[in-house]
Amino acid sequence: MSASPDDLSTGGRLQNMTVDECFQSRNTVLQGQPFGGVPTVLCLNIALWVLVLVVYSFLRKAAWDYGRLALLIHNDSLTSLIYGEQSEKTSPSETSLEMERRDKGFCSWFFNSITMKDEDLINKCGDDARIYIVFQYHLIIFVLIICIPSLGIILPINYTGSVLDWSSHFARTTIVNVSTESKLLWLHSLLSFFYFITNFMFMAHHCLGFAPRNSQKVTRTLMITYVPKDIEDPELIIKHFHEAYPGSVVTRVHFCYDVRNLIDLDDQRRHAMRGRLFYTAKAKKTGKVMIRIHPCARLCFCKCWTCFKEVDAEQYYSELEEQLTDEFNAELNRVPLKRLDLIFVTFQDSRMAKRVRKDYKYVQCGVQPQQSSVTTIVKSYYWRVTMAPHPKDIIWKHLSVRRFFWWARFIAINTFLFFLFFFLTTPAIIMNTIDMYNVTRPIEKLQNPIVTQFFPSVMLWGFTVILPLIVYFSAFLEAHWTRSSQNLVMVHKCYIFLVFMVVILPSMGLTSLDVFLRWLFDIYYLEQASIRFQCVFLPDNGAFFVNYVITAALLGTGMELLRLGSLFCYSTRLFFSRSEPERVNIRKNQAIDFQFGREYAWMMNVFSVVMAYSITCPIIVPFGLLYLCMKHLTDRYNMYYSFAPTKLNEQIHMAAVSQAIFAPLLGLFWMLFFSILRLGSLHAITIFSLSTLLIAMVIAFVGIFLGKLRMVADYEPEEEEIQTVFDMEPSSTSSTPTSLLYVATVLQEPELNLTPASSPARHTYGTMNNQPEEGEEESGLRGFARELDSAQFQEGLELEGQNQYH
């Protein structure tokens, strides 16, 4: 295939122009070496990945303990929790015992992660883990399929072009090397649409595997807001529904209160109680224990300072517990005065709840609901009625944040994030700013691809990890009422910010703040808009993202195993702890759930990068496959060994499906931009690209809409609906677990027996009732420690047994 002189001159002129316009600073980090430095970055990442595995194997082996209880009580190693087996999180099944027997070699954990059966992982981690790994299977098979046309069709077409000279090794693998007169460009457009259709079919097949959960269909309870706070008699609410909706039977009415301070005091009180019990049991065996209670006591070994004086541990925690208990009781007495305008109303069956909900569906549009004789008292025309979430899904501390203040906080936080990320701190802008201040001049003089290519790809990966953490933690500041809504917002926010930070803005050459602002507000600069879109097809740009995917696949997944952030936070908290019970609590609280929302967002970000450049730079596809395989293995290990079982709303998984459907649309957009800029807006390929993009968008939106309709249909209760304890009649709930009531846990839990001898875990370790007193004391100490450290395990059993979700 030959190219005309115009093509050759245009190619050279285009490359020189776009390099100057896209990268206006000296830019050590955004311009590449021969073949984009890809081989060097790949080899260096492989070496670092092997090093990370070796380091992790040493750390994990050093902290290994199958008993786990003795490790938590007696081992102060900084790595004991982070890298040890989280055996307290799940019941010791035959599968777990078999895995422990096999997990004794230096790198046996690595091979166990590969050979582990899906059934073992699902039995331990729950149904959400099944949906997650099946989703990864679909992506892996899809990318494996598109590797064939990408490497077998598109790559040879690109490389055999003659627009660029033979010295441009990496550039010849991109679409820039194909002549504008070549009919083979039709294959690029056709395959971009084929990728979308294939991906859509895979996602549709994945959605069919979502089994409807009873926990989402069993609710007969409504959540009602804007109820007058002066209503204290539930009979008024019952009377209103009885008169306004004849035949409706209300079985339970729960009022809500502001319990933020009460929950905090209860946590502190329980920590003090655990400290007293621990040192009481220990004093009976070893005598009085002295501790230094200053947070910085570990920094100073001198006992002469007053603030570092040692005190009697048992007496200190007894006095602290007494003080906090008094404050707790005082706050508990004030709680009835802190009524919220929110109630939960449970009906006899779901049809009654559905009838009321339907009547209030259009209240905001001015449609009046049915009235009763007490309507003017309960002000039912102001109510907002929705189906109640599961009690375990509610974050009770956040219910006191009213909707107006909630929206004000939500808008303020996300506006700040928008300006922070879009205008100031996208990874490429940070890296380009480093260049502007001559920080990288010594690196530039080296002219070494190890530094000039590996360094920027590591920086880009690092910023795409650090910056979304800010987004991740911002979701907690927004004070969502339910964990499901919190996770759903988290997965969407992280993905949107990541795609703009990593894919869209850097691809268009918006790599410095001044260029970005000029692109937004300068009228004359906008006349050169075509130059910005040429940046998408700059060869160095493609190499930059190939290196990013390689780094995410190897070094990135290796760092997910190390979890240095968790280790740093844990070691810092442990360093400033004052006593052994506090360290026990720190270890217990460190056992967190697997963050599906965050992992979905990061995985979909890399998948979007791969799909965006799968046509214009096909060499990125096999590295995308490498990333998905490495991510799958890493997540299997982390879910099984490192995190607690997690229950989710299925909307989280559907959000990831929507993002996966959106990813190939970026490739269609990129193909359309190329056609407009290189072929003209009236060229047949341009018109075809625009048509396929519009068709793909329609298919995507229709598919997502039908998926939501299916979820709504699954949500609707069936005629023979399974009855759950929190929907039963009051007379039938005498033994109802308190965690299943629509009342904050801190208001309903019975008082604990505060003596170690009565600990329910006392005989967990096979202790005998007729043992000597010393044995009883030792058993009580160990049993109490087991009680302290098994909270996450008990929670996991409760959730698994009741098929609930967080």
Curated annotation (Swiss-Prot):
Membrane topology: Multi-pass membrane protein
Tissue: Expressed in podocytes of kidney glomeruli. Significantly reduced expression in patients with focal segmental glomerulosclerosis.
Any Gene Ontology biological process: glomerular filtration
Entries under InterPro entries matching the protein: Csc1-like, CSC1/OSCA1-like_7TM, CSC1/OSCA1-like_cyt, Csc1/OSCA1-like_N
Localization per Swiss-Prot or TrEMBL: Endoplasmic reticulum membrane; Cell membrane
UniProt GO MF annotations: calcium-activated cation channel activity; osmolarity-sensing monoatomic cation channel activity
Region annotation Disordered: where it falls in the sequence: 755-781
Keyword tRNA-binding included in the entry's annotation: no
Modification type Phosphoserine: residues: 77, 80
Keyword field: Calcium, Cell membrane, Disease variant, Endoplasmic reticulum, Hereditary spastic paraplegia, Ion channel, Ion transport, Membrane, Neurodegeneration, Phosphoprotein, Transmembrane, Transmembrane helix, Transport
Extracellular topological segments: 1-37, 160-182, 434-448, 520-542, 615-617, 679-683
Catalytic activity: Ca(2+)(in) = Ca(2+)(out)
Ways its activity is controlled: Activated by hyperosmotic shock after mannitol treatment.
Gene Ontology CC annotations of this record: endoplasmic reticulum membrane; lysosomal membrane; plasma membrane
UniProt feature coiled coil, ranges: none
Function statement: Acts as an osmosensitive cation channel preferentially activated upon hypotonic stress. In contrast to TMEM63B, does not show phospholipid scramblase activity. Enriched in mitochondria-ER contact sites where it may regulate the metabolite flux and organelles' morphologies in response to osmotic changes. In particular may regulate mitochondrial motility and function in motor neuron axons. Required for the functional integrity of the kidney glomerular filtration barrier.
Alphabetical list of PANTHER family matching this protein: CALCIUM PERMEABLE STRESS-GATED CATION CHANNEL 1, PROBABLE MEMBRANE PROTEIN DUF221-RELATED
Connected disease: Spastic paraplegia 87, autosomal recessive: A form of spastic paraplegia, a neurodegenerative disorder characterized by a slow, gradual, progressive weakness and spasticity of the lower limbs. Rate of progression and the severity of symptoms are quite variable. Initial symptoms may include difficulty with balance, weakness and stiffness in the legs, muscle spasms, and dragging the toes when walking. In some forms of the disorder, bladder symptoms (such as incontinence) may appear, or the weakness and stiffness may spread to other parts of the body.
Description of how the protein assembles with itself and partners: Monomer.
Protein name according to UniProt: Osmosensitive cation channel TMEM63C
Taxonomy of the source species: Eukaryota, Metazoa, Chordata, Craniata, Vertebrata
